[in-house]
Regions:
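C-terminal catalytic core of tyrosine-transesterase DNA break-rejoin enzymes
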Residues: 265-292
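Catalytic-site neighborhood detector that most strongly recognizes the C-terminal catalytic loop/helix
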Residues: 276, 287-317
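Conserved tyrosine-mediated DNA breakage-rejoining catalytic core shared by Y-recombinases
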Residues: 165-216
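C-terminal secondary-structure termini that scaffold catalytic or DNA-interacting sites
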Residues: 309-333
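A short, glycine-centered helix-capping/turn motif at helix boundaries
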Residues: 142-146, 151-181, 277-280, 289-291
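Basic, Lys/Arg- and aromatic-enriched nucleic-acid-binding interface segment
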Residues: 114-161
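Active-site/catalytic core of tyrosine-dependent DNA strand-transfer enzymes
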Residues: 207-270, 275
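Non-catalytic DNA-binding core/recognition domains of DNA-processing enzymes
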Residues: 2-86, 214, 248, 264-268
C-alpha cells in the first residue's frame, strides 16, 4: 500500500505518505477481513467518526484508488463526500471560533508559559545529571525534549518540522547537494546564532528553503540541551517521527495542566493570542510559519475569549512512556 502510493505521488513528503497509510489502516480495521472499497461498505463504517477524520480517511482512499487505476465512477461518491467535509471545515475555520472538539484544550499563551514554569525545576535537575555521573533515561530525555520544543514553539510555532531534524554547521550544510538538502530539515549551529534550515515541510513546494532564526533565549536553552544530551554535528536532535513528536507534546501538557496541546493547537494558541485582536505583523509570521496570511487568518487565528482556564494539575501516574526513537522512526532518504 505504501509503495503504491509512493510511486503514484513521488514528490509527497514521507510524513504525508505515513498519514495516508495510517488512515487506510484505520479504515481496513473498520471494514474487517477482505475490505471492499465501495461507497455502500465504506461510508456507513466511518459515519460515526468526527467529520475531519472522515475527510482524512476519504482523501487517503481517493489517492489509493487513483493510484490503483480505479475508474472515476468508483471514486466519485468518495470525492463528493470528502469535498462536503472540506467545505464544512473551511466554514468552521472562517467563523473565527474554535471548534467544539478543540475548545477544551484551547488555552492562552500565558497558560503554556505557566506550564513551562511548572516543568522547569525538573529540567534544572536533569541539566545537572551528567556532571553528577548520572545517565539520563528516556523519561528524562523526553521531558527535556518536550520542554525545549515548547519553549521554541511559543516563539515560532512550526508544524512537526523538528521531527528527525539534523544538527549541522554552516560549512557542513554548504557542502550538501540540493538533493541532500531537499529531503531533510537542519538545525544550523554558528558561533553567535542558530538557524533552522527548512527544506522538507508541508508547503515547501510553494515557499522553498526557509531560514528560521532562533530566538536568543531559546538558543541558549538549545545549546544547553544538545550539550546535556551529548549531541554533535550530524546527530538527529529530536529523534521522533512527526506523529510521535506531537504526541510527546500532548502527553506532556496533559500530565502538567490536563490539556492536550500538540503542534496544531500551539499554532492556534500563538496566532490567536497575537492576532486575535490585532493583525499587526501577521505577514512576517505567515512567512516564518510557511503559509499565506489568508490561511493564517482563516485557519489558525481564533477568538482569544475562547481560551480555557487550566487546572492546578499534576497527575500522580508513572513517568511519560518511552517514545519511538530514531531507530524506529521512518527512514529519510
Amino acid at each position: 500500500m505504501e509503495q503504491i502510493i509512493r510511486e503514484y505521488r513521488p514528490d509527497v513528503k514521507d510524513s504525508t505518505i505515513g498519514a495516508y497509510v495510517r488512515s487506510l489502516t484505520k479504515l481496513n480495521g473498520l471494514l474487517g477481513e477482505n475490505p471492499e472499497y465501495t461507497p455502500d461498505k465504506v461510508l456507513p463504517v466511518i459515519e460515526s467518526l468526527h467529520y475531519t477524520t472522515q475527510r482524512n480517511i476519504l482523501n487517503s482512499l481517493i489517492v489509493y484508488l487513483k493510484a490503483t487505476d480505479n475508474p472515476p465512477s468508483k471514486i466519485k461518491s468518495f470525492i463528493e463526500k470528502r469535498d462536503k467535509h472540506n467545505t464544512q471545515y473551511k466554514e468552521e475555520q472562517m467563523s473565527g471560533k474554535i471548534s467544539e472538539k478543540q475548545k477544551p484544550n484551547f488555552v492562552s499563551l500565558d497558560s503554556v508559559r505557566e506550564m513551562l514554569e511548572k516543568i522547569k525545576p525538573e529540567i534544572d535537575i536533569i541539566k545537572k545529571m551528567p556532571k553528577a555521573g548520572i545517565t539520563l533515561n528516556r523519561a528524562n530525555r523526553n521531558l527535556f525534549s518536550a520542554y525545549t520544543l515548547f519553549q521554541f514553539y511559543i516563539t515560532a510555532p512550526l508544524r512537526n518540522d523538528f521531527a528527525m531534524m539534523e544538527m549541522t554547521t554552516r560549512r557542513a550544510y554548504n557542502k550538501l547537494s540540493l538533493d541532500e538538502k531537499r529531503h531533510k530539515n537542519y538545525m544550523l549551529f554558528e558561533k553567535n546564532k542558530i538557524n533552522l534550515m527548512l527544506n522538507n515541510y508541508k508547503t515547501a513546494g510553494t515557499y522553498g528553503e526557509k531560514t528560521i532564526p532562533m530566538d536568543k533565549k531559546v538558543e541558549r536553552l538549545m545549546r544547553n540541551f544538545v550539550k546535556v544530551l551529548g549531541y554533535k554535528t550530524g546527530d538527529v536532535v529530536f529523534p521522533y517521527s512527526s506523529n510521535t513528536l506531537t504526541q510527546l507534546l500532548i502527553r506532556t501538557s496533559k500530565k502538567y495542566i490536563n490539556k492536550k496541546i500538540g503542534t496544531t493547537m500551539l499554532r492556534h494558541i500563538y496566532l490567536s493570542d497575537k492576532y486575535g485582536e490585532s493583525k499587526l505583523e501577521s505577514q512576517a509570521d505567515a512567512e516564518k510559519m510557511g503559509h499565506s496570511v489568508k490561511t493564517q487568518q482563516d485557519v489558525y487565528v481564533k477568538d482569544p475569549n475562547d481560551f480555557q482556564p487550566i487546572e492546578d494539575h499534576l497527575e500522580n501516574d508513572p513517568p511519560l512512556p518511552d517514545f519511538i526513537l530514531a531507530d524506529d522512526s521512518p527512514e529519510i532518504v
